[in-house]
Amino acid sequence: MRNKSVIISSALMVMLIASISFNAYYINSVSTELLDMIFALPSEYEYIVKLEQSKLEEFKSDINTLSVIWEKNSRRICIVTRYSDFERVNSAIYGLREYFFAANYSQYLTERKKLIAALEKQKNNELPSFENIF
């Protein structure tokens, strides 16, 4: 009887560790993908205002793709992350999109910085640390 309890406890512990590891990997991979896309977007006001319309349309398409990737993954992410971190990323993505499409580039750059910080925080919160464990 005691052996059975040890085996069941061990199996549950392995499943728990596997689940936590998968969540950390998933959040890390999605956040890294989004950060790579954001770093490819323009980051200087002087550069943006001098862009030709075709290049602006290309960046709009990239921002739409970023939004689609977030939408596709957000349902899973909201289950495993802190709500405040999730909402910060969500809000920054929509702000980034709206300000760029409205040609309000100074606000777009602010939202871009917020989004980078929010994604990095979300990514770091999934790493094993004393704070996350206790």
Model-derived segments and spans:
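Non-cytosolic head/periplasmic domains of membrane-anchored proteins
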Residues: 95-134
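N-terminal positive-inside, membrane-proximal cytosolic segments immediately preceding the first
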Residues: 1-7
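Alpha-helical transmembrane signal-anchor/signal-peptide segments
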Residues: 27-44
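Short helix-adjacent coil turns
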Residues: 45-58, 96, 100-107
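Short, solvent-exposed, charged loop/turn and helix-capping segments
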Residues: 67-88
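Short, charged, amphipathic alpha-helical segments
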Residues: 56-64, 83-91, 109-114
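Hydrophobic membrane-insertion alpha-helices, especially the h-region
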Residues: 8-22
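Short N-proximal segments of mature Sec-exported proteins
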Residues: 45, 61-72
